[in-house]
Amino acid sequence: MQTQKIRIRLKAYDYALIDRSAQEIVETAKRTGAVVKGPIPLPTKIERFNILRSPHMNKTSREQLEIRTHLRLMDIVDWTDKTTDALMKLDLPAGVDVEIKVQ
């Protein structure tokens, strides 16, 4: 039994994609006998941009855009070598950024 834990942080623009990826990671870790805490949804980061609609005049007419970045956090406790091998072989979608730390 190890005292270290694996912390996985997922980041994506599409919430459905990140939830599916988090579920795959949880199922894979539980299949190998590890204990998983999470996925914990972290606050969504919202970036807003104001862009002029007209190239010359009409400063009052603007387009408002936003980008939402969804975050999920998971801790894998009591992991084994089988768990790390299974997580390394896991194929996640291209729109999900995965950050893994061993603490």
Curated annotation (Swiss-Prot):
Task: Name any Gene Ontology BP term.
Answer: translation
InterPro entries in alphabetical order:
Ribosomal_uS10, Ribosomal_uS10_CS, Ribosomal_uS10_dom, Ribosomal_uS10_dom_sf
Keyword list (alphabetical) reads: Ribonucleoprotein, Ribosomal protein
The source's superkingdom equals: Bacteria
Write out the GO MF terms.
structural constituent of ribosome; tRNA binding
Gene Ontology cellular-component terms for this entry are:
ribonucleoprotein complex; ribosome
Q: Which Gene3D superfamilies match?
A: Ribosomal protein S10 domain
Name the job this protein performs. Answer: Involved in the binding of tRNA to the ribosomes.
Mind telling me which HAMAP family this protein's record contains? Ribosomal_uS10 (MF_00508)
Self-association state and partner proteins as the record states: Part of the 30S ribosomal subunit.
State the family named in the UniProt similarity comment for this chain: Belongs to the universal ribosomal protein uS10 family.
Protein name from the UniProt record:
Small ribosomal subunit protein uS10
Q: From which lineage does this chain's organism come? A: Bacteria, Pseudomonadati, Pseudomonadota, Betaproteobacteria, Neisseriales
